[in-house]
Amino acid sequence: AHVGNGGSIAAVDHGKCVDTSMGLTPVEGLLMGTRCGDVDAGALSFIMEKEGLDGHGLSDLINKKSGVAGLVGGSSDMRDLEAAVEAGDERATMVLDVYNYRIKKYIGAYAAAMGGCDILVWTGGVGENQWATRRVVCENMEYMGMKIDVEKNEGMRGEEMVISTPDSKVTIIVVP
């Protein structure tokens, strides 16, 4: 899981990438800092008509004015979003919930398609530094053998570290 201001999930089988959350462009997939991620194709023509956009205007909207920044109505920086959540901002809480849900959804989908998961690698700005996102995404994944060590996860700073419990069937690792 490479998550930061941009982000993608890749399914890797024996060292070969067999699927990725990004499509022809990086817009498909996860909710990102300024990119919308997966969106109903019918919504695009609706937005174009409603907002009077041409193709370039729509591209600008979904690449530069959507995602976390568009939903929260401000910054795309996850540190700002987490600070707003800690301050009790309900909209920021909803945005962070959506952000985390989309990551979990892709991990679960790829694990199902591949018949399981052996290792989950976290990288990118959020993957490396936001212990709360790692915790929330890995919570309730015990059914597939994934158990996060809460203390290791929260104590991890700037170094490669395994953050799964010793009895976890899935190795969870952070790689800066």
List each model region and its residues.
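Internal helix-turn-beta structural module
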Residues: 93, 97-117, 127-176
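Conserved active-site and cofactor/substrate-binding residues in soluble primary-metabolism enzymes
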Residues: 4-7, 38-42, 53, 57, ...
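Adenine-nucleotide phosphate-binding core of ATP-dependent small-molecule kinases
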Residues: 60, 67-70, 78-113
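Glycine-rich beta-strand-to-loop/alpha-helix junction loops that act as flexible
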Residues: 3-5, 121-129
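Oxyanion-binding "anion nests"
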Residues: 48-74
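Hydrophobic alpha-helical scaffolding
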Residues: 33-37, 48, 71, 96, ...
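Glycine-rich phosphate-binding loop of actin/hexokinase-like ATP-binding domains
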Residues: 1-49
